[in-house]
Amino acid sequence: MAQKGNIGVTTENIFPVIKKFLYSDHDIFLREMVSNAVDATQKLKTLAAQGDFKGEIGDTTVRVTLDKEAGTLTISDHGIGMTEEEIDKYINQIAFSGVTDFLDKYKENANAIIGHFGLGFYSSFMVASKVEIITKSYREGSKAVKWSCDGSPAFEIEDADKAERGSDIVLHIADDCKEFLEKNKIEELLNKYCKFMAVPVAFGKKTEWKDGKNVETDEDNIINGVEPLWTKTPSTLKDEDYKNFYRTLYPMQDEPLFWIHLNVDFPFNLTGILYFPRIKNNIDMQRNKIQLYCNQVFVTDQVEGIVPEFLTLLHGVIDSPDIPLNVSRSYLQSDSNVKKIATYITKKVADRLSSIFKENRKEYEEKWDDLKIFINYGMLSQEDFYDRAKDFALFKDVDGKYFTFEEYKTLIKDNQTDKDGNLVYLYANNKEEQYSYIEAAKNKGYSVLMMDGQLDTPMVNMLEQKLEKSRFTRVDADIIDRLIVKEDAKKTDLTDEQTANLSQVFRSQMPKLDKTEFFVEIQALGEANQPVLITQNEYMRRMKAMSQFQAGMNFYGQMPNSYNIVLNSDHELVKKVLADAEQHTAEALKPVLAELKGQEARLAVLHQSQDKKKPEEITQEEKDDLQNTQKAVNDEKQKRDNIIADYAKDNNIVHQLIDLALLQNGMLKGAALDAFLKRSVCMIK
């Protein structure tokens, strides 16, 4: 006899909330339905194991059946089933109090509803206009019953014709959700959410190629493996088992470096396998490869709140019943179990890396280039991971040799300590472009690190804070004798006038490059060093690089690139240029320099006179006189600079020296490079 009624009065608001707030994530309904079927099957197995069920368990397969013509999707199990009383208890009456408070709390975070307080079943109404439950309990003498509801609080329950125990959940798919009547869509969702559920899940039959087409066989198409690798005892597994499982998870990925098998049952339950992938340089492309499961049911691959951010670069699976199927981000951030899990995983990762380093240093070094970005990311983002990793993190020098932090400190402390007692770490980020700078450092007996990774700039900044009395400088940041200052630098013996003239010779001929500034300086570097070098200030270069990582540093990113053109006043060619410039410009400069000298003397007198007066005591005539004299000085300097520039533009040695320095830094390109090559040929003839 049919019975009609209303689902418990406290549920009147639930259906609109499900429809409205869960609509954007309605795919999860299938996970909930299949998960419930698996639970019912598992409960029957438990009852049988305890002796509370004496019958035959039989086929435990959960079946998902699609009937496009009828517009239905059915999930069937042979689990414990339900009596009419149990339907009333678990379906008609939702077993929690304070539903209004609950809805107010979670309406802005819809995912938190499903999975709490027995609401998982109701996710079916996200896609169905009507839901039917046809069920028969495992209990002796139970009658089969059919429950139906159209999404309103009203329901109907009646006797049903069902011989076998278990439940069939029949979803009549709504008109606006017809995509869930497509075979490919259901296969996609089953593969996503149910791939490792603990009992077999069948969807249709397997097919085989016969008579030029695919035809169905009698064999069930089982979409899941019921005993995934992470549920097995590590001691029973071989390396090939882990590699095969990785290929199952990530068919298109390269073979992993190594892995960690997690297995803990106190103070929380956690199993899983984490793989170290061969990480490429782009960190952002590597995230969201860890899959989170709850009792073998897929939850999410957005695990930032569950594992520390740097561990999201790992691949693999984490399974924990202590993390609910559906949780909000704020829940993850505050839950004590989640925090313990994050700490545990971090420690296990550090322990695994440390053990590989200690047990097989050679293998560890071979894998360092792939591990480096991961370990650096961890050290930058987690203080406790830095404390562990500092003992197995490595430096790599330009010759491909590896050192721990402590080993490298011991290596360089005698030769690379400056006059102020600071240990100077020299590094390069491009061996080819910085070759001559690297060789100059080696000729001094210095060691040069290779730091060409995506995170090396912030890593350098951090290490300068962590390592006592230490600083890092790129090998092309200055001339070699000023990278590690052992004693006061030798002074150039040029006069002020010679310094100004020589600087203008080269300054006037520097190329006009976009967002680039050149500053000329003169140093006495010795006859054996290069005549002209280009260096880039370490601080400014590093700040520009850091602007790509940190918000609020855009100011540095917008600034032009600044380079120093260092002229070696001891070099024969530079001396030749200066002597030639003095000879060819002497006559033209003579009256200009004489006038300049006179105007500068007058300007000095005017400044001296006005400096003795208060601002209000200086007359307008005196102010004008000072301004006009300053203008006259500037005009004469401009005349001098123009004369020198006119000379320099036709001096092939000047252009050749500049271009050689630019070429050394990879800055000579296009038409300028072509002109350099042609000039070189002409000078050789």
Report each predicted region and the residues it spans:
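GHKL (Bergerat-fold) ATPase N-terminal catalytic module, capturing the glycine-rich phosphate-binding loop
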Residues: 1-180, 188, 195, 590-595, ...
